[in-house]
């Protein structure tokens, strides 16, 4: 029995990055032998075990054979006769197909070290095309390793996979899983650039793909292209360290601009409503989790109005806080403002734009939530009277503390 560290742990160590998870391949063993040594079996589809002390994953060396479409259409063969080189051959990229033995010696049959030095994402073998998830993984690695480029022959293979309909067989949960990981990488825009370059974006996220080439008013969007704007927005969200729900909302806030009637371009009247409609279909199709879905819909619907707050009377500002459910969900409202911040600063030349109204809105929200609605309600005789009295008390508190319209308060 021989044990090797493989995959991301070896890759990241060679890149000088922190090693998070360590995976191992075991050559020349059987499931029975692993159990006898105290390893705990956890693999459902192939033999994977947890170390009795470290709880790191140890997988028996295996080969895979394509038996059908999609990422589940595989037959796995694990056997003591399977060699390390055979196991590494089934990996997606050369930089992930490097092994290290217990003495620190590298086993690199597919020249992954050379590709690390050259900063190239290259497929190990033609078997790459058997698993469409690998297209998403390559795109995600491009977002993580921002100095790496996709090898020409790998991009060509990915295009052929898309043309052959392989990505159409992907299950929604797996698409979302990879997109979510990619959005949390260093430069998410690179994931979508790679997916667009190979044609996968049009198949997986047509609502996003059609934004590229759609013009916006140059005065407000010097970058002009709506798709370029969205890429700037998600990269700003990444630099700011915003959460996944905020990044997903940033990605999808302008989907409606892709269906703006040509005769009104570069204006996008009513794009918020169209964005909501497209987004409802997208989140249902990909089975997006509720926290991401709810924030994205909120941002798509209201992101334009937040920039009008400075012109509003106190009562109108309060209605805006009610429309966004800020009083009941202040944490989500903060996330809403974060996505709007990314939208405002994700524009060429506006990266450092001051947004004084945003912290002011949070102050006003905090003030409004201190108004004792319960005490006011006890003095009223009907639900309508309660609603009106509470609203009036909140407006009075706002006007006592701030000068409206707020644009005068912030200069």
Swiss-Prot record:
A Pfam short name: PolyA_pol
Residues bound to ATP: 8, 11, 91, 137, 140
SUPFAM superfamilies associated with the record: Nucleotidyltransferase, Poly A polymerase C-terminal region-like
Residues that, per the record, bind Mg(2+): 21, 23
Cofactor: binding details: Magnesium is required for nucleotidyltransferase activity. Nickel for phosphatase activity.
Cofactors, names only: Mg(2+); Ni(2+)
Domain HD: 226-327
Transmembrane feature ranges: none
GO molecular function: ATP binding; CCA tRNA nucleotidyltransferase activity; cyclic-nucleotide phosphodiesterase activity; magnesium ion binding; phosphatase activity; tRNA binding
Enzyme Commission designation: 2.7.7.72, 3.1.3.-, 3.1.4.-
Keywords: ATP-binding, Hydrolase, Magnesium, Metal-binding, Multifunctional enzyme, Nickel, Nucleotide-binding, Nucleotidyltransferase, RNA repair, RNA-binding, Transferase, tRNA processing
Residues annotated to bind CTP: 8, 11, 91, 137, 140
Catalytic activity: a tRNA precursor + 2 CTP + ATP = a tRNA with a 3' CCA end + 3 diphosphate; a tRNA with a 3' CCA end + 2 CTP + ATP = a tRNA with a 3' CCACCA end + 3 diphosphate
One GO biological process term: RNA repair
CDD domains assigned to the protein according to its UniProt record, in alphabetical order: NT_ClassII-CCAase
HAMAP family: CCA_bact_type1 (MF_01261), CCA_bact_type2 (MF_01262)
Additional notes on this entry: A single active site specifically recognizes both ATP and CTP and is responsible for their addition.
Summary of subunit composition and partner proteins: Monomer. Can also form homodimers and oligomers.
Similarity-based family: Belongs to the tRNA nucleotidyltransferase/poly(A) polymerase family. Bacterial CCA-adding enzyme type 1 subfamily.
Function text: Catalyzes the addition and repair of the essential 3'-terminal CCA sequence in tRNAs without using a nucleic acid template. Adds these three nucleotides in the order of C, C, and A to the tRNA nucleotide-73, using CTP and ATP as substrates and producing inorganic pyrophosphate. tRNA 3'-terminal CCA addition is required both for tRNA processing and repair. Also involved in tRNA surveillance by mediating tandem CCA addition to generate a CCACCA at the 3' terminus of unstable tRNAs. While stable tRNAs receive only 3'-terminal CCA, unstable tRNAs are marked with CCACCA and rapidly degraded.
Written domain comment of the UniProt record: Comprises two domains: an N-terminal domain containing the nucleotidyltransferase activity and a C-terminal HD domain associated with both phosphodiesterase and phosphatase activities.
Name of the protein this chain belongs to: Multifunctional CCA protein
Species in which this protein is naturally found: Methylobacillus flagellatus (strain ATCC 51484 / DSM 6875 / VKM B-1610 / KT)
């Amino acid at each position: 029995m021989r044990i090797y560290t493989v995959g991301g742990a070896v890759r990241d160590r060679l890149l000088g990055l922190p090693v998070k998870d360590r995976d191992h391949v075991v050559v020349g063993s059987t499931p029975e032998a692993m159990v006898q040594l105290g390893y705990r079996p956890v693999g459902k589809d192939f033999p994977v075990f947890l170390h009795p002390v470290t709880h790191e994953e140890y997988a028996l060396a295996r080969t895979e054979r394509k038996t059908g479409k999609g990422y589940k259409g595989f037959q796995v063969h694990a056997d003591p006769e399977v060699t390390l080189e055979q196991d590494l051959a089934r990996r997606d990229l050369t930089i992930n197909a490097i092994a290290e033995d217990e003495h620190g010696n590298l086993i690199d049959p597919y020249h992954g070290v050379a590709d690390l030095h050259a900063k190239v994402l290259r497929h190990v073998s033609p078997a790459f095309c058997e698993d469409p998830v690998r297209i998403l993984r390559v795109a995600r690695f491009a977002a993580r390793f921002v100095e790496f480029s996709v090898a020409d022959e790998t991009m060509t293979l990915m295009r052929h996979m898309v043309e052959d309909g392989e990505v159409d067989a992907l299950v929604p949960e797996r698409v979302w899983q990879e997109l979510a990981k990619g959005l949390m990488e260093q430069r998410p825009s690179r994931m979508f650039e790679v997916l667009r370059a190979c044609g996968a974006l049009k198949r997986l996220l047509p609502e996003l793909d059609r934004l590229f080439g759609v013009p916006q008013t140059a005065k407000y969007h010097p970058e002009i292209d709506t798709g370029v704007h969205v890429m700037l927005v998600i990269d700003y969200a990444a630099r700011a360290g915003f959460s996944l729900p905020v990044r997903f909302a940033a990605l999808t806030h302008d989907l409606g601009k892709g269906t703006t009637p040509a005769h009104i371009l570069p204006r996008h009247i009513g794009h918020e409503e169209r964005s909501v409609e497209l987004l409802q279909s997208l989140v249902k199709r990909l089975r997006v989790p509720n926290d991401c879905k709810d924030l994205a819909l909120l941002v798509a619907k209201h992101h334009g109005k937040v920039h009008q707050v400075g012109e509003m009377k106190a009562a109108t500002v309060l209605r805006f806080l009610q429309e966004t459910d800020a009083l009941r969900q202040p944490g989500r409202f903060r996330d809403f403002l974060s996505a709007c911040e990314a939208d405002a600063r994700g524009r060429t030349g506006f990266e450092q734009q001051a947004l004084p109204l945003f912290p002011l809105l949070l102050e006003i929200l905090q003030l409004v939530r201190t108004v004792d609605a319960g005490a006011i309600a006890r003095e009223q005789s009907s639900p309508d009277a309660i609603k009106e009295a509470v609203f009036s008390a909140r407006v009075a508190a706002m006007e006592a503390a701030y000068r409206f319209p707020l644009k005068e308060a912030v200069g």
